[in-house]
């Protein structure tokens, strides 16, 4: 039972961190992780994004749409197969993820003392 309580505390800590992250960057953790994935791999399909983030295809589609609406990623049509769709960071998306990666997160609370 003690392990279950620790898992609950980890879940709460992540939820608190995400709330602060959203306030700071106007991005959910999944949106931030999508930007990180595209920084590491500049051209990914929606299926590759789903696999990289461990999301269902349905959730990935919603996530992509949300980040596209924020103009942080762009669609690229495949050169060989015009039916193939790739996603990459826009200049604004690159700027955003570099800001996120270089900022110190000491101001965002992750209450590890409960773990």
How should each PLM-predicted stretch be described?
Residues 1-25, 72:
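N-terminal leader segment of winged-helix/HTH proteins
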Residues 10, 14, 96, 100-104:
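Hydrophobic/aromatic residues within well-ordered alpha-helical segments
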Residues 17-58:
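N-terminal helix-turn-helix DNA-binding core of bacterial DNA-binding proteins
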Residues 42-86:
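Canonical helix-turn-helix DNA-binding module
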Residues 79-100:
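Basic, amphipathic "hinge/linker" alpha-helix immediately C-terminal to the N-terminal HTH DNA-binding motif
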Residues 106-112:
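Conserved small/polar residues in nucleotide/adenosyl-binding loops
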